[in-house]
Curated annotation (Swiss-Prot):
Active site location: R274
Protein name listed in UniProt: Pectate lyase 2
GO terms classed as biological process: pectin catabolic process
Glycosylation site list: N37
Species this protein is from: Ambrosia artemisiifolia (Common ragweed)
């Protein structure tokens, strides 16, 4: 059954319920009014952007979870996560032994050397006692339940093929480190964590989708140390100074090959800067919704190429903060040669986007990773279900 058919069924079901249970308006006249939840269900079922259209609106999603791996777009396209492995169900929210985690815990599953598609038995809040080190070929899939990870963040270091989907990560602290399980072997000594919700270092084929990220000690997502082929999509970033860092230092020349996509995300509720902040690499920032910022929205140094396409930039009211961009680390003349381009972007409330450089000639790899941009006027709709969402077995998401 396709998306349209599922939506029609849901629509007529909700309409029938409304007919049987009419409510009254403030004026006292009998009136059929859809609830907020009904409106959100219809909106979600519609699956508005290219990633969600790949899998949402299908009632059999629970029995075909691994089809999600075919839906990655941008530079993480082809990331399969744990598609070729077993489905592993997390049954416990405990994290009481980080060196030798018990079977049934998220830490045990994440450390395995084999591919796994990790799901959750029920709603749970996982209070991590140390950073969670995720091994290669894993999908962490929170669909069907509400999964929150707090206190500690996720670390993806020198790994490949990771999908993180529909997880709420918040209130992440710097943790002291120690002996931590990171693979099938003995635990290894880890230094203190940085306090990011998701830290990606030296890794490739990483897809972060439909996550809600907020309140961390440092940043929300850091991608550094030669990481590449990364897509951050359909996420909601809130209540944090620093959102996304793509390249950590102007001396890290290994990031010259970084390819990253930032697509269909919502930045709102007191996010100050780094949406993203880029160094060296090649970045497509496409169809995101920027609902004000503090210092700036998108920044960079070390001559990154940043292609902004079809975004909606709603500037803050402060007249000195209207600039979308921040160029740092060099003189004005040099930075104005960097290829920072704008196409189809919507600038609102006096937002200013000062382009520089020229339209680059794309390599075949760069061309293959580009997501077709819709006009900025569509960004609000395309990001309307960003972040985690409710999804029930037997019904379309």
């Amino acid at each position: 059954m396709g998306i349209k058919q599922c939506c029609y069924i849901l629509y007529f079901t909700l309409a029938l319920v409304a007919l049987l249970q009419p409510v009254r308006s403030a004026e006292g006249v009998g009136e059929i009014l859809p609830s907020v939840n009904e409106t959100r269900s219809l909106q979600a079922c519609e699956a508005l952007n290219i990633i969600d259209k790949c899998w949402r609106g299908k009632a059999d999603w629970e029995n075909n979870r691994q089809a999600l791996a075919d839906c990655a777009q941008g530079f993480a396209k082809g990331t399969y996560g744990g598609k070729w492995g077993d489905v592993y169900t997390v049954t416990s929210n405990l994290d009481d032994d980080v060196a030798n985690p018990k079977e049934g815990t998220l830490r045990f599953a994440a450390a395995q050397n084999r591919p796994l598609w990790i799901i959750f038995k029920n709603d749970m809040v996982i209070n991590l006692n140390q950073e969670l080190v995720v091994n290669s070929d894993k999908t962490i899939d929170g669909r069907g339940v509400k999964v929150e990870i707090i206190n500690g963040g996720l670390t993806l270091m020198n790994v490949k093929n990771i999908i993180i989907h529909n997880i709420n990560i918040h209130d992440v602290k710097v943790l002291p480190g120690g002996m931590i399980k990171s693979n099938d072997g003995p635990p290894i000594l880890r230094q203190a964590s940085d306090g990011d919700t998701i830290n990606v270092a030296g890794s490739s084929q990483i897809w972060i989708d439909h996550c809600s990220l907020s309140k961390s000690f440092d940043g929300l997502v850091d991608v550094t140390l030669g990481s590449t082929h990364v897509t951050i999509s359909n996420c909601k970033f809130t209540q944090q100074s620093k959102a996304i860092l793509l390249g950590a230092d102007d001396t890290h020349v290994q990031d010259k090959g970084m390819l990253a996509t930032v697509a269909f995300n919502m930045f709102t509720d007191n996010v100050d800067q780094r949406m993203p902040r880029c160094r060296f690499g090649f970045f497509q920032v496409v169809n995101n919704n920027y609902d004000r910022w503090g210092t700036y929205a998108i920044g960079g140094s070390s001559a990154p190429t940043i292609l902004c396409q079809g975004n909606r930039f709603l500037a803050p009211d402060d007249q000195i903060k209207k600039n979308v961009l921040a160029r740092t680390g060099t003189g004005a003349a040099e930075s104005m040669a960097w290829n920072w381009r704008s196409d189809k972007d919507l600038l609102e409330n006096g937002a200013i986007f000062v382009t520089s450089g020229s339209d680059p000639v794309l390599t075949p790899v760069q061309s293959a990773g580009m997501i077709p941009a819709e006009p900025g006027e569509a960004a609000i709709k395309l990001t309307s279900s960003a972040g985690v969402f409710s999804c029930h077995p037997g019904a379309p998401c």
